[in-house]
């Protein structure tokens, strides 16, 4: 009875959201074909991945050309541009690249087409966590286009074997002190990066943030407190340098590249930078999956999911383009541009591994990854996580109070 009631409430909620925001747009233009527009944040890859993808498609589809609408590099601006467009029910955006945690929000509001029936895609070749990141309430709403996972960068000249657990890693901090460098850093400034870093350590210790309904808070648990405590204690005792709570991606990367850290949590893009001739750690570092409680940790997933707009006039073309984006051909272009692919087989490709030696570690990291909280209220949930985690780090809240604050913030996120 309880399960049936929850299912009924969930269905009613989804129906209400669709009615209020998308109307019957989800049932319209299902067979429409013609030119479409693809929307994604600024393409910062050296090889111009998005341009290559679209050129290949356009060469094979002269009557269904794709135009690239390039957004800014700022994630908040990307989100707000899409939201403004969809609130107005405009049909100018046909396929949109959603940052992973936005998928649930856009699905709940009826803004993107579920990938079922004639829009279904083959997810078998894809990494399972990437598919989970595009799923809301048991239904697939987007196709994973490219992914991302956290990696542990470590000084292999000082630490021959990478640690597998937080206890093992922090137990090696004396090596950092002996070499007059910091032990560990991540992205701990009060922004989305802190949500990511906090989520990873809490998930690694068995905690979670929201229930399957995307709304019920679950963070106030012994497991969540244990995870956050590890991070807070490491900062208090100096294993994490004091300046590290000002670090975003760039600052943390610079600290590692200049030889000031023994361990760093960061994304795969850093590998090429750290191995450049200008880097102080060129040929002196390795990469591994993030540490966990008793074994490999729980990376947070990054990347983009490609979704079909509910307001598109040419949804059949849009569906074919989405399928193309996850094809072997397209994903080879993605991977060659140093963007982590969503196809599992490419992580074992010898040619790609020769170019990107971190791929085996990244595959292992993504295989154990956990999506950021899957909720239609993600911006508010993320704010609750980062605000309270930062308060615990800087000592204005205890770990228990910070976790209780997250619980309350998640509880009120939809109000």
PLM regions and their residue ranges:
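Conserved N-terminal structural module of periplasmic/extracytoplasmic solute-binding proteins
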Residues: 1-104, 279, 292-294, 409-415
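Glycine-centered hinge/linker elements that transmit conformational signals in sensory
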Residues: 173, 215-245
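Paired acidic/hydrophobic, glycine-rich loop segments that form the ligand-binding mouth/hinge
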Residues: 94-97, 262-266
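Short, solvent-exposed loop/beta-turn-alpha elements that line the ligand-binding surface or hinge
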Residues: 117-126, 187-192, 207-226, 275-283, ...
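C-terminal lobe and pocket-closing loops
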Residues: 267-282, 291-387
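Hinge/lid segment of periplasmic solute-binding proteins
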Residues: 100-149, 161, 168-170, 282-286, ...
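Short helix-initiation/N-cap motifs at beta->coil->alpha
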Residues: 71-81, 101, 167-168, 243-257
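Short glycine- and hydrophobic/aromatic-rich loop-to-beta-strand nucleating segment
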Residues: 150-154, 202-203, 306-308
């Amino acid at each position: 009875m309880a399960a049936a009631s929850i299912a009924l409430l969930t269905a009613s909620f989804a129906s209400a959201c669709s009615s209020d925001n998308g109307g019957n747009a989800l049932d319209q233009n299902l067979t429409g074909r013609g030119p479409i527009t693809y929307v994604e944040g600024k393409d910062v890859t050296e090889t111009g991945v998005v341009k290559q993808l679209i050129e290949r498609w356009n060469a094979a589809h002269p009557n269904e050309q794709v135009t690239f609408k390039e957004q800014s590099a700022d994630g908040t601006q990307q989100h707000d541009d899409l939201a403004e467009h969809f609130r107005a029910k405009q049909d100018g955006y046909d396929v949109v690249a959603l940052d992973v945690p936005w998928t649930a929000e856009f699905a709940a509001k009826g803004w993107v087409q579920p990938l079922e029936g004639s829009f279904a895609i083959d997810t078998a070749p894809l990494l399972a966590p990437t598919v989970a990141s595009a799923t809301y309430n048991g239904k697939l709403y987007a196709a994973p286009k490219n992914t991302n996972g956290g990696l542990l960068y470590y000084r292999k000249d000082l630490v021959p074997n990478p640690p597998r657990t937080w206890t093992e890693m922090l137990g090696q901090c004396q090596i950092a002190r002996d070499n007059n460098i910091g032990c560990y850093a991540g992205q701990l400034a009060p922004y989305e990066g802190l949500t990511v870093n906090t989520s990873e350590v809490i998930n690694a210790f068995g905690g979670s943030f929201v229930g399957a309904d995307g709304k019920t808070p679950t963070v106030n648990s012994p497991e969540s407190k244990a995870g956050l405590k590890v991070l807070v204690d490491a900062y208090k005792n100096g294993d994490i340098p004091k300046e590290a709570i000002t670090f975003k991606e760039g600052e943390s990367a610079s600290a590692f590249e200049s030889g000031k850290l023994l361990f760093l949590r960061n994304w795969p893009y850093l590998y090429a930078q750290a191995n450049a001739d200008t880097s102080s750690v060129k040929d002196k570092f390795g990469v591994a999956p993030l540490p966990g409680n008793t074994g490999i940790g729980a990376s947070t997933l990054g990347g983009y999911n490609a979704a079909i707009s509910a307001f598109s006039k040419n949804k059949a073309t849009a569906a074919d383009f989405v399928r193309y984006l996850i094809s072997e051909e397209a994903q080879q272009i993605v991977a060659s541009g140093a963007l982590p692919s969503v196809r599992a087989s490419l992580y074992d490709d010898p040619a790609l591994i020769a170019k990107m030696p971190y791929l085996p570690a990244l595959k292992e990291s993504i295989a154990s990854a956990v999506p950021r909280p899957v909720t239609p209220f993600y911006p508010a949930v993320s704010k609750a996580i980062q605000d309270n985690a930062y308060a615990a780090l800087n000592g204005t809240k205890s770990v228990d109070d910070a976790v209780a604050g997250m619980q309350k913030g998640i509880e009120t996120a939809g109000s």
